């Protein structure tokens, strides 16, 4: 089925993002657009510092405090994300409906917390499941993303995982 026949689940049109720095406005993103359709994977590529992370963080309400969307529109499931003003608003979709896997998984994982607990917290927050059932689901997620010996790995810290394994843990959390 051609994309023209379907509605995108995420549509960004002519998005502009600026940052305030020492009293000046710094334009970081100018007229950037994309459509993401159900069941598709989208990769955003570009040179280091070109704005990929800034652009995608705007979909999750995760811009730095001095950053703001200054133009264009971002629609998710037909809802205008510009109307999401508070953290409470963003928590209705962040992690539940939209997630992002960063290139460096160490920036997404707490180095002081065991891997299993981090996955459990995501399950508790996003699905409302706690205790032994959350632990069981966390172990299943580790297995599902190809982490060998999930019972042992559940008790380990991020620094005890390879980079590729950490990235799979972040995918399990997402």
Placement of each model-derived feature along the sequence:
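ABC transporter nucleotide-binding domains
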Residues: 1-174
